[in-house]
């Protein structure tokens, strides 16, 4: 069984899409830009908030306006990041079972670090040994920097670790970190995207994910 399970957050542990859309559309509105739909936001997420905004603004938007949208997003989202966000059904129970089995669980996300810390504490108190989000000086996924940071923080270099996520970014992150990857199909990417990214293990349910973790 794996000893350290490092999870992505958005689309893996939490369904955050509605709050991301709300925050994005608020920020876009400050510059007079049209709102984006839920399917559009679903397609844009995965590479951090700045990339989300770059994809969401109209083509040809200058850098100053992109920066203004980014600056509007963060204070709004800091207050509203949990308005509609919910854990995926069964995920809290899974984390509790892993804890009972002696597995250490952690989170590495491209979401802003303030939001990762807030949401992890609110929805999974006592269940995550460490969490790391996007912050200055640490390259975002698929670079493995934050994964290595969490492993060092936990003193877990000797543990058998696995990375779990819902996107092609997560598959690449695991590969770059030299870790096996378990992909989940209930998140923000369709199965064919995961397959095309090289996903080898794709779980469609919490039971399947638990089995994959036990077999690792």
Predicted segments — roles?
Residues 21, 25, 38, 42, ...:
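An amphipathic alpha-helix signature
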Residues 7-9, 73, 147:
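Conserved hydrophobic/aromatic "anchor" residues
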Residues 27-28, 48-62, 119, 150-151:
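Helix-loop "lid/cap" segments that line or gate small-molecule binding pockets
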Residues 6-8, 108, 164:
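Generic enzyme active-site microenvironment
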